[in-house]
Amino acid sequence: EWISKAPEREVVCARGGTQVVLDLSNPQVQDFIVQTVDELMNSYPDIDYIKWDANMSIITQGSQYLTKDNQSHLNIEYHRGFENVCRRIRASYPQLTIQACASGGGRVNYGVLPYFDEF
């Protein structure tokens, strides 16, 4: 239920059948990601660099979280959720260097410049 895909559709994995995209329109997914980063940072306090790799595109358009009438809003709500996650991580770890990686910069999202140190 946290994977980005249309309701009642099969999951499509990419990159050798191993990758899916988490549905960041879902606040529970956002919380999970932030909690995971928190746990890593608390367990390994010497971490000073994270590479946020966006190799996987949303190839299965749809959300199991959004209502039927809001499916067309997925890209907007996904981006809002992504920004929320980035904002929370940056606020908690301002000293952490975070690199946004997406196709060698070919899919750079300049809207998230405030949250990343490198592209």
Q: Where are each of the predicted segments found?
A:
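Active-site neighborhood of glycoside hydrolase catalytic domains
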Residues: W2-F119
